[in-house]
């Protein structure tokens, strides 16, 4: 019976491919015709064309669309070319508009001043670190600009091998263009790809094309070259009003190909996703556009991976504790103003993602504070004065001891009233009046104009003698200009009026600081109490070199020895500067002595000198 049932299972016709009839059970042969009449294997099965392995409907739709898109590669290449040209022009317009922004110009000026003082190796390292943050579109843009700059440079033909510009650069450019064209969106993502260009969409830039070309000549030349290549290969010039986006207003710095749609209900007004970064529609993507200075922005430049030095390490969720020490305003570790002066600005949120929106506001404040600080430091007499960083490292490593030592030093400075031309120690800040006084003292010291103290007794410039310590400021980390009257230099004798005790102080113009260090009297002194020689002495006026030596102005003998004293006293400030008397203090002293000689001449005291 079992063999009979097995034989009846294959009782369908030979031509049939499949059957929907259930398997036979323990029925007899009388039901065989009934089973045959119910067999539907003669009808074509709707699943007969399906292969053994199932596939999705998307795959069949892609196969169905493929034969009708035979000319798509050429069309897509032309569209990509037009989009690239349009994207370069858009980038150029936005760059020109950003360059005219006053806030951006101020920040850029501060960055350029910082960049100008770097060495060539440091500049190369900085540029290399910045290039690590560029996108693919920016890389292509920079390649075009650098190629144009290299071809226009007069030394490129001498430094490059023969025909490198024709073979090497063009070959690299062709390979790059081929590689970028292969990264285009496939036909399955045409719905999210680049929308068709709308010829009616005009640019909203208010800048003239000649202005943009004048601001960026190399980039404009690269774009013109691209247009010429497109015209040569296609025979049609690219339209000037082409816009690669569906929306009318340009709200981004870059073309729509490097932006992602936001999480909104209507995605038609948003630019399409980037073909180079395969992200989902719901996955957030940070904007690549650089907003204005007043808006929130992502910080740029994680330079630690590029080999640049950083004072403090940075991490994704680092918490920076506030040190106990109160640092001065111009300290390189100024923890009171902003941590941007201590660390490189990270690419991602330094304080974690839990802060959310306040981080963007904080990063904006950090960027503005950094720009303002750079601008302020670069405009203080065109020099930047910073405290020594080693002092703060010692204070930070020894916590309490370093703080107490710094405070004690500051207390001594306040009690003693020492007028140091350098910056104060930790914990003491300068106000505007103190800083102006220190600047005036430094300028007077550099000019060399000092007057002898005329007050009776011990006349000390700056305060009492009690808490003054005769130590070198350089050992304490001061960055000071050399001041001969500073109580901390030269054992403090330069600031004391010691004439009554047999120790002569220096009067008038100090021409050589070595006179203080060696402890000898300036040339022309014959005794500690004898005043300098009279500048109106007729015998001295006949000998200009000796006369200048008596005034401690003998370094200008070669500039003035060809003049008679009658001609010399008629010179004004501008004429003295033209003759090489560059020091302001020397010119002022000469003019003052000239007036004395003129008065003596008017009184008839110099009749012997004119004879």
UniProtKB/Swiss-Prot annotation:
- Bias (Polar residues) occurs at 230-246, 260-271, 292-318, 398-415
Classification via Gene3D superfamilies = Transcription Factor, Ets-1
Positions with biased composition (Basic and acidic residues): 509-518
Recorded protein name is: RNA-binding protein vts1
**Organism this protein belongs to:** Emericella nidulans (strain FGSC A4 / ATCC 38163 / CBS 112.46 / NRRL 194 / M139) (Aspergillus nidulans)
Question: Matching PROSITE patterns, A to Z?
Answer: SAM_DOMAIN (PS50105)
Give the matching SMART domains.
SAM
Concerning PANTHER family, the annotation shows:
PROTEIN SMAUG, STERILE ALPHA MOTIF DOMAIN CONTAINING PROTEIN 4-RELATED
């Amino acid at each position: 019976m079992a063999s009979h049932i097995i034989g009846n299972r294959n009782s369908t016709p030979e031509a049939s491919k499949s059957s929907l009839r259930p398997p036979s059970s323990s029925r007899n042969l009388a039901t065989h015709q009934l089973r045959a009449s119910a067999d539907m294997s003669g009808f074509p099965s709707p699943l007969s064309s399906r292969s053994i392995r199932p596939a999705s409907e998307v795959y069949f739709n892609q196969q169905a669309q493929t034969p009708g898109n035979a000319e798509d590669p050429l069309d897509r290449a032309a569209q990509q070319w037009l989009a690239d040209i349009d994207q370069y022009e858009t980038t150029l317009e936005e760059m020109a508009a950003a360059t005219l922004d006053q806030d951006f110009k101020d920040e850029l000026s501060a960055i350029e001043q910082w960049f100008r003082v770097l060495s060539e190796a440091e500049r190369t390292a900085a540029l290399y670190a910045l290039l690590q943050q560029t996108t693919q579109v920016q890389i292509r843009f920079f390649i075009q600009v650098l190629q144009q700059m290299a071809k226009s440079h007069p030394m490129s033909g001498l430094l490059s091998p023969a025909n490198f510009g024709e073979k090497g650069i063009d070959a690299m450019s062709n390979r790059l263009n081929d590689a970028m064209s292969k990264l285009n969106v496939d036909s399955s993502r045409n719905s999210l790809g680049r929308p068709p260009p709308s010829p009616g969409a005009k640019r909203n830039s208010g800048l003239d094309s000649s202005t943009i070309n004048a601001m960026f000549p190399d980039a404009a030349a690269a774009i013109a070259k691209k247009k010429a290549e497109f015209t040569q290969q296609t025979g049609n010039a690219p339209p000037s009003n082409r816009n690669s986006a569906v929306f009318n207003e340009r709200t981004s710095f870059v073309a729509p190909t490097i932006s992602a749609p936001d999480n909104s209900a209507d995605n038609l007004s948003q630019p399409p996703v980037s073909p180079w970064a395969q992200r989902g529609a719901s996955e957030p993507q940070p904007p690549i556009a650089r907003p204005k200075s007043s808006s929130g922005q992502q910080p740029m430049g994680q330079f630690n991976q590029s080999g640049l030095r950083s004072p403090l390490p940075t991490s994704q969720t680092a918490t920076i504790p506030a040190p106990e020490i109160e640092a001065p305003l111009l300290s390189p570790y100024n923890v009171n103003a902003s941590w941007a002066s201590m660390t490189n600005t990270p690419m991602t949120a330094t304080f974690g993602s839990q802060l959310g929106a306040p981080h963007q506001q904080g990063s904006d404040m950090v960027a503005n504070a950094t720009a303002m600080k750079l601008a302020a430091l670069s405009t203080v007499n065109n020099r930047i004065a910073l405290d020594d960083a080693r002092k703060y490292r010692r204070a930070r490593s020894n916590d309490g001891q370093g703080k107490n030592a710094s405070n004690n030093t500051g207390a001594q400075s306040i009690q003693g009233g020492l007028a140091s031309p350098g910056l104060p120690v930790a914990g003491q800040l300068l106000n505007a009046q103190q800083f102006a006084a220190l600047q005036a003292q430094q300028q007077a010291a550099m000019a060399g104009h000092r007057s002898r103290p005329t007050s009776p007794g011990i006349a000390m410039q700056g305060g009492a003698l009690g808490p003054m310590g005769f130590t070198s400021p350089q050992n304490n980390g001061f960055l000071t200009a050399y001041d001969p009257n500073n109580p901390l230099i030269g054992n403090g004798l330069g600031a004391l009026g010691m004439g009554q005790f047999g120790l002569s102080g220096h009067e008038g113009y100090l021409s050589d600081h070595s006179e203080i260090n060696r402890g000898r009297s300036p040339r022309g002194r014959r005794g500690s109490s004898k005043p300098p020689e009279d500048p109106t002495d007729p015998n001295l006026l006949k000998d200009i070199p000796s006369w200048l030596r008596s005034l401690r102005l003998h370094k200008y003998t070669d500039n003035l020895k060809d003049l008679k004293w009658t001609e010399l006293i008629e010179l004004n400030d501008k004429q003295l500067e033209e003759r090489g008397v560059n020091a302001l203090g020397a010119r002022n002293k000469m003019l003052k002595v000239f007036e004395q000689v003129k008065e003596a001449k008017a009184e008839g005291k110099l009749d012997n000198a004119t004879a």
